[in-house]
Amino acid sequence: MVRVLPVVVLLLLALPVRADEIAVPAGQGTLANAIAGARPGDVLTLRAGRYEGAIKIDRPLSITGPEGAVIDGMGQGTVVTIDAPDVTLRGLTVTGSGMNSEALDAGVKILKGADRAVVEHNRVIGNLHGVDVHGGRDAQVRSNTIEGTRQVRVNDRGNGIYVWNSPGTLVEGNSVRWGRDGIFSNASRTGIYRDNLFRDLRFAVHYMYTNDSEVSGNVSIGNGLGYAIMFSNNIVVKDNLSLSDISHGVMLNYANNAEVSGNLVRGGAEKCTFIYNAHKNLIWGNRFEGCEIGIHFTAGSERNVLTGNAFIGNRTQVKYVGTRDVEWSFEGRGNYWSDHPGFDLGGDGIADSAFRPNDLMDHILWSQPAAALLTGAPAVQLIRWAQSSFPATLPGGVVDSAPLMTAPQIAVSDRYTALEADAASRRNESEMNDLDVDNLTSH
């Protein structure tokens, strides 16, 4: 019996301790005290009412509550700091962070070592940064409503979701409005950012030095720029919408080996797509519609494949300043051009004549803008007629040897169409007063 008792005690100690569900009343200091007294794995259930921030969660816990449970930082620092693994924050309102940009004040901050955090179904309102994933691995930020601040200068605002050096982050199903960027991902990798809605921001999604990640199924409406992929490699950008964004829909700047597919950009952006010093990218099955420039291709971008895209009703379909021929078809399949008067006698869906979207006068106008005064002159019209009649006189540029006869269709729901119309009606009232996306050193 003496020998058996220690064995029984050891077995009992090895059994998992049952997590408790603890009701936490609203009031000053009640939440901080409840965290201090909780055991790992406990569930703290808040009641409707106001709770004092700033709080630090330093052990694995779940904190849940109704939307009426408000954690308020009262303008001081970060409202909720997660500093332990396996923490869940669900169903709450988080508001009132400080406004210190150097300290990265936020509604919710996930620190290094706080792996597998889950932040879901919360309202994160009126903070400098909404959710700052700052070193924690495999975080999940899902189905939150995040609304930032509206300082006069957009660049003085914080980001809805900031991901820094946090591999494996999943950002899914969030609605982000106001602030600077919807998602700003910096020095990270293997993230998935999908099915989010972004409105009234500088950039919807902004990548810097982020590799091996995915941006898919997102909707950007009325932002300064939709999807900015910068200094990043091996990114998948697919099935996103950019509706009535102001400057660009999709931008690849020093981005390599990306796959850009199934995206729709429409509604009057200056450039549907901007490709700047980006190499070996596959751009296919996209629809670029109703922009000043369909695609601007510059700074020596090489070895890119463009096939199966549609360029529809853009004032200038392609802006490419170069003297070399660049082929924009792949394996006998090119792109659809709304201004190509082609015909298809073979009935295979491929036009029987190649298409060049630009001519010599386009190159002259891009390099010498003052020449625009001469565009109506008979000599200019004669040059354009001669080049259309004798293609061998063209100086080089984009050539599509297998233009498509039909355009890919990408559906937009009634809800997003209504939001697009609202954003278009407010375009002249945009808050993007200090936006200069073409200054590529400023991001």
Located regions from the model:
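Sec-dependent signal peptide recognition
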Residues: 2-9
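N-terminal signal peptide c-region/cleavage motif recognized by signal peptidases
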Residues: 14-16
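Acidic Gly/Asp/Thr-rich repetitive segments characteristic of extracellular carbohydrate-active
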Residues: 21-52
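Extracellular beta-strand-rich solenoid/capping regions of secreted or surface-exposed proteins
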Residues: 36, 51-64, 71-116, 129-136, ...
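Extracellular beta-strand/beta-solenoid scaffold signature
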Residues: 73-81, 102-111, 126-133, 153-164, ...
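Surface-exposed loop/turn motifs in large extracellular/passenger domains
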Residues: 80-91, 108-120, 135-142, 150, ...
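Functionally critical loop-and-helix segments that line ligand-binding/catalytic clefts
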Residues: 271-272, 282, 289-443
